[in-house]
């Protein structure tokens, strides 16, 4: 449910001319969500909405009236806890708008930056998009490239290769 709500807010922000200002301000607030005290203040029903607004305003040196109105809207609808999802969805929509996609390469060993760049260049050509890859270590002997936003997944494992070789050899015999 929160993802649907976050998607609507992010879509509205993405259509604005000052999307980058909103995004930067939301990132500031999003970074505060790791603090338990901050979350307690945001989620508390005992703290008045005006005090919450003052508290959130204290995070910013330069006041943006549009962003303040957005925060008031979130406060009035008790949706401040949706800020992390809004930021995540906004990042996704910004990347889609700018034709930038983030993917993950799962491998048993850490890949060098050179290998990651080489994979990025090849995927950039294939999808005609700007692909950024991150490497995550997995326990499998396989290598897997996942581009969730594009619905693309490529997997290569030694077991699968051995099985295909065995099948091929058995067909020949």
Swiss-Prot record:
Entry membrane topology: Peripheral membrane protein
Keyword Transport tagged: yes
Gene3D superfamilies: N-terminal domain of the delta subunit of the F1F0-ATP synthase
One cellular component term from this protein's GO annotations in UniProt: plasma membrane
GO MF annotation list: proton-transporting ATP synthase activity, rotational mechanism
SUPFAM superfamilies: N-terminal domain of the delta subunit of the F1F0-ATP synthase
Keyword line: ATP synthesis, Cell inner membrane, Cell membrane, CF(1), Hydrogen ion transport, Ion transport, Membrane, Transport
Localisation per UniProt entry: Cell inner membrane
InterPro entries registered for this protein in UniProt: ATP_synth_OSCP/delta_N_sf (IPR026015), ATPase_OSCP/dsu (IPR000711)
Assembly behavior: F-type ATPases have 2 components, F(1) - the catalytic core - and F(0) - the membrane proton channel. F(1) has five subunits: alpha(3), beta(3), gamma(1), delta(1), epsilon(1). F(0) has three main subunits: a(1), b(2) and c(10-14). The alpha and beta chains form an alternating ring which encloses part of the gamma chain. F(1) is attached to F(0) by a central stalk formed by the gamma and epsilon chains, while a peripheral stalk is formed by the delta and b chains.
Xref: HAMAP family: ATP_synth_delta_bact
Function: F(1)F(0) ATP synthase produces ATP from ADP in the presence of a proton or sodium gradient. F-type ATPases consist of two structural domains, F(1) containing the extramembraneous catalytic core and F(0) containing the membrane proton channel, linked together by a central stalk and a peripheral stalk. During catalysis, ATP synthesis in the catalytic domain of F(1) is coupled via a rotary mechanism of the central stalk subunits to proton translocation. This protein is part of the stalk that links CF(0) to CF(1). It either transmits conformational changes from CF(0) to CF(1) or is implicated in proton conduction.
Family, similarity comment: Belongs to the ATPase delta chain family.
Annotated protein name in UniProt: ATP synthase subunit delta
